């Protein structure tokens, strides 16, 4: 998840009070060949859409995100994150909290080529840490892999995670 972090469309490191909100469309016009067969492995991965590291008080809401060939919304070591009203159709993972705490993900609709929401506890921050105090609710997830997943790149752990009212297609 940490590879090519700085090449993401929206990058934030050690930021406070970050908001990416509004009735906006982000279409990354992927490198995927539209003539290809859905579900084929993507050979060329482009940049992540939104990538944040060690940020506090993050709000991401009311966005449409399309054609991302890497992680759509990835955040590592962040605290107090609110993600809501996201509609996405992407080729890899949708939302990936990594070693983050006090996270709320709600009222989102996603169609992903890989995992819908994947909780990670990787070594991307060069230390062991955990995902903690996460609440996910009122989301619709259509995925070619795991709609909800715990454990990719996990070295730390998970604590106090509540998932409710999820519709998996």
Q: Where in the sequence are the language-model features?
A:
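Extracellular/periplasmic carbohydrate-active domains that bind, remodel
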Residues: 1-169
């Amino acid at each position: 998840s940490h590879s090519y972090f700085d090449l993401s469309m929206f990058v934030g490191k050690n930021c406070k009070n970050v908001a990416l909100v509004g009735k906006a469309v982000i279409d990354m016009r992927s490198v995927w060949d539209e003539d290809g067969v859905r579900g084929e492995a993507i050979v060329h991965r482009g940049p992540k859409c939104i990538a944040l590291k060690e940020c506090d008080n993050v709000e991401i809401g009311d966005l449409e995100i399309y054609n991302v060939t890497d992680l759509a919304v990835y955040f590592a070591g962040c605290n107090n994150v609110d993600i809501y009203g996201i509609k996405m159709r992407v080729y890899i993972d949708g939302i990936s909290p990594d070693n983050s705490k006090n996270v709320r993900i709600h009222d989102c609709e996603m169609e992903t080529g890989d995992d819908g929401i994947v909780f990670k506890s990787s070594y991307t921050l060069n230390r062991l840490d955990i995902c903690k105090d996460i609440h996910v609710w009122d989301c619709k997830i259509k995925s070619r892999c795991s709609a909800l997943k715990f454990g990719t790149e996990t070295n730390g752990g998970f604590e106090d995670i509540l998932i409710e009212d999820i519709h998996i297609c």
